């Protein structure tokens, strides 16, 4: 009886102890939650600060980039205007040369008509005395000389026009390259090197046949102007004797390249050119790479052509692109 009363007397203090523990646990949970929220808020504030800092840096960088791009654009526009002015001036010069060529053609036509008339007069006068015949013969010789002079002037004008067209094409390529355009497009089976394309022909040909073969391919026999170009050719001729575009057909000893330029760089074989046996007026490049004058009617198994490389041109520039000059005819 007393034990039961004792046990019932201490029961309430145990319940109060449990309530105190639960309160402490709840307080710890609340403090932990508060600490977690405070940490999360601190992380959010740090992220916001870093993001704002990065956005500011990006904005400053963008402003600098826009400023640089604006300056570059202004410089490009200024250069473009200057280049357009040069192209217009060269086009005007080309038109003037074309007009002069037309005038020379008209003069040549008149000279031909005059010559025809005079030849008819000479035929009618052949029955006259020998003195008149001699005078007429002299007159005929004079007229032939006049016609020859007219043809020479016409050819000189034509050569000048071809050179100008090629210079315009080269200048246009330089303009495109300065704008970042790639000028390295070559026809199939041609090799590119330093803004030109090269074709290494095979088959037995005389020099004149090799020249015509290059012309049929819209090119001409190669003109060599530097040691680098010589080295490039040596890598591809496979040690075969090859025709190149050098000759002195017009005047012995005065060699001229197929592009009309005189000889600057040379790689003659020792003792060459020697015109051995007389009539060695065309130049070949031996398998060793050294040059030798040879008979133009000799047959070689290889020959080298060249032409200017073309450029990758965007649509706005394509409308003003000059045409490639036709290969210059050789004497």
UniProtKB/Swiss-Prot annotation:
It comes from the Eukaryota. Ca(2+) binds at residues 272, 292-293. The keyword Secreted applies. InterPro entries: C-type_lectin-like, C-type_lectin-like/link_sf, C-type_lectin/snaclec_domain, C-type_lectin_CS, CD209-like_CTLD, CTDL_fold. It is found in: Cell membrane; Secreted. Disulfide bonds join 183-311, 186-197, 214-305, 282-296. Low-affinity receptor for immunoglobulin E (IgE) and CR2/CD21. Has essential roles in the regulation of IgE production and in the differentiation of B cells. On B cells, initiates IgE-dependent antigen uptake and presentation to T cells. On macrophages, upon IgE binding and antigen cross-linking induces intracellular killing of parasites through activation of L-Arginine-nitric oxide pathway. This is Low affinity immunoglobulin epsilon Fc receptor.
